[in-house]
Design a protein with these regions (language model features):
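Cleavable N-terminal export/targeting peptides
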Residues: 1-54
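Signature for the C-terminal beta-barrel architecture of outer-membrane proteins
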Residues: 45, 150-154, 173-346, 378-380, ...
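Outer-membrane beta-barrel biogenesis signature
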Residues: 40-62, 101, 118, 347, ...
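Extracytoplasmic loops and strand-loop junctions of Gram-negative outer membrane beta-barrel proteins
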Residues: 47, 73-77, 124-128, 166-169, ...
Length: 452
C-alpha cells in the first residue's frame, strides 16, 4: 500500500511502501510456505505419521562446540584496560529429513571464566572498554527447512542469514553470541546462473542478548533485539567467471525494543527508529585465471540509502567500493577503497545496522557505526599460507567523507591454524592510531576452538 504522500506527490522518495503497512503481502507467503510443506507430506503415510516423526528425531544429529577467547583492549579513552576471558558452549541438534523437511535447534551458552574485568554492555563496568560478549544462554536457531523445491529451499523460524560478503546482512560470527533472524526466507536457483533470495524479518536477535541492559545503564541503544518489519531481496546473474552481477533491495523497518520513539539514542543516531533505512544497490564481481598459478579478482559496488518507515531523519547517502586482488600460489594481495557517505549531521550517514561490521573498516571496531561525516577507507591486504597456517596483514587509512582532516590509521594482523580435524587456534591484533583527538586503541585476541 502506498502512502498518501506517494499518491499525491511527484517526489520520487515518496513512492515507497510504508514500513508499518507492508505486512499485508507477507501473509500470502506464510500461507504458501505452509502449503508447500503440506504438499510434501503424502496422504498415504498419514497412519504412520507419528512413527515417522519419532524416527526423524531419533535419527537426528547432535553436535557440540567449545570456543574459548581471551580479548585484551587498551583504549586511551578509558582509565582501565579490558581483559575478557570467555567460553562459548554451543549445542546443535538437527532432525533427520521428514517429507523433505528438517528441524534445526542451536543453543549457545556464554560465560566469563577466570575473570571479568571488562564492560560486557550489561555488567555496569563502564571504567573498562567494551567487549561485547555478555553472559547468557540463548536459543539462536529454531527453524524448519523445506528442501522439496527443486533448486530451492524455504526456511521458517529463527535462522542465520548471510548475504554476499555480509556487508549489509550477516550474523556477526566473530562475537561469541551470534546475530540471528526470526524470519521466513526463500532461496531459489532458477538456473545455474540466475539465483534469487527473499526474506521477511519479524525480529532480529542481536549479539547483545539474551538479556537487555539495566535501565540505569547508558547502553540502552544496545538492546537484545530489534523489532522488525523488514524485507530483504536480492538476485544475481553469472554471465561468466569474470562477470557476476547482483542487485539488492534491503528495506529495514527496525525499532529498538528498549527505546520507544522518540527516546534519544546514546550513540547520537536520533530515536529508536533511526536504524530504519531503504538500501538499493548493485555489485559486480569476477575472477580470471591468468596462468602460472596467478589469479585476478575484483569487486565494484554502488548502493543508495535513504530514510525509511518511521526514521525521523531525512537523508539520502551513497555507498561505493572498488577492490582488486591478485593471488599467486600461496600468496595474495588486495587493494581497495570504500566510502560510506555522511552529511556531517548526526543520523544522516550511510549505516549498515544488520551487517557483520567487524569484517570491515578495521578490527578495532571504531567504525561499527558510520560517523556523521561519513567514512573513507583505503586499505591494502596481504595474505600467505605457511607453516601449516594462514596469515593476513591489513593496513587501513581512515578519513571523513565530508569535511577535512583524518580519523587515523590501523594495522590488523591474524594468524590461524587448524589441526586434527576438530580443533583450531587463532591469534589476532588490531592497532588503531587516531588523529584529531581521536583516542588510540589496541586490541589482542587469542582463540581456541573445538567442534565435534
Amino acid at each position: 500500500m502506498l502512502s498518501n504522500k506517494a499518491q499525491n506527490s511527484g517526489d520520487p522518495k515518496a513512492w515507497r511502501i510504508k514500513g508499518d503497512q507492508s505486512r499485508w503481502w507477507t501473509q500470502p507467503l506464510l500461507i504458501l510456505a505452509g502449503i508447500a510443506l503440506g504438499l510434501s507430506m503424502p496422504l498415504a503415510g498419514a497412519d504412520n505419521f507419528g512413527t515417522d516423526v519419532a524416527d526423524a528425531f531419533k535419527n537426528g544429529t547432535f553436535n557440540v562446540g567449545f570456543r574459548y577467547r581471551y580479548e585484551f583492549v587498551d583504549w586511551d579513552a578509558r582509565t582501565k584496560d579490558a581483559n575478557a576471558s570467555t567460553l562459548r558452549t554451543r549445542l546443535v541438534y538437527k532432525t533427520a529429513p521428514l517429507f523433505d523437511t528438517f528441524l534445526t535447534l542451536n543453543m549457545d551458552d556464554l560465560r566469563p571464566i577466570i575473570g571479568s574485568n571488562f564492560n560486557d554492555t550489561r555488567n555496569g563496568k563502564g571504567q573498562y572498554p567494551v567487549v561485547a560478549d555478555p553472559k547468557g544462554t540463548d536459543l539462536n536457531l529454531a527453524s524448519l527447512t523445506f528442501t522439496g523445491l527443486e533448486g530451492g529451499k524455504i526456511v521458517l523460524g529463527r535462522q542465520r542469514i548471510n548475504r554476499e560478503n555480509q556487508r549489509f546482512i550477516g550474523t556477526v560470527p566473530w562475537r561469541q553470541n551470534e546475530q540471528t533472524f526470526d524470519s521466513l526466507s526463500i532461496d531459489y536457483a532458477f538456473t545455474d546462473k540466475f539465483k534469487a533470495f527473499y526474506s521477511y524479518v519479524d525480529r532480529v536477535k542481536r549479539i547483545f542478548g539474551p538479556d537487555d541492559p539495566l535501565p540505569t545503564l547508558p547502553t540502552q541503544a544496545l538492546s537484545a533485539n530489534f523489532s522488525s518489519n523488514s524485507h530483504l531481496l536480492d538476485a544475481s546473474y553469472t554471465f561468466s567467471p569474470l562477470f557476476r552481477l547482483k542487485g539488492y533491495a534491503y528495506l529495514l523497518d527496525l525499532e529498538n525494543d528498549l527505546l520507544p520513539s522518540p527516546t534519544p539514542l546514546s550513540i547520537g543516531l536520533g530515536t529508536s527508529d533511526s536504524f530504519s533505512s531503504q538500501t538499493l544497490g548493485l555489485r559486480l564481481t569476477g575472477k580470471q585465471d591468468l596462468g602460472g598459478d596467478l589469479n585476478f579478482s575484483y569487486a565494484a559496488e554502488f548502493a543508495a540509502q535513504q530514510d525509511y518507515a518511521d526514521n525521523p531523519n531525512n537523508y539520502d547517502e551513497n555507498y561505493y567500493v572498488v577492490e582488486a586482488g591478485l593471488d599467486w600460489a600461496k600468496f595474495g594481495f588486495k587493494l581497495g577503497y570504500e566510502t560510506l557517505e555522511g552529511s556531517g549531521v548526526a543520523g544522516e550517514s550511510f549505516q549498515t545496522p544488520l551487517g557483520t561490521n567487524h569484517k570491515f573498516n578495521g578490527w578495532a571496531d571504531l567504525f561499527l557505526v558510520t560517523p556523521p561525516g561519513g567514512l573513507e577507507d583505503l586499505y591494502i591486504q596481504g595474505t600467505a599460507k605457511a607453516l601449516g597456517g594462514k596469515f593476513s596483514l591489513i593496513y587501513h587509512d581512515f578519513s571523513p567523507q565530508t569535511g577535512s582532516g583524518d580519523y587515523g590509521s590501523e594495522i590488523d594482523f591474524v594468524a590461524s591454524w587448524s589441526f586434527m580435524k576438530n580443533y583450531s587456534v587463532l591469534a589476532k591484533f588490531a592497532l588503531f592510531d587516531g588523529d584529531n583527538n581521536i583516542s588510540d586503541i589496541n586490541k589482542f585476541w587469542l582463540m581456541l576452538s573445538a567442534d565435534f
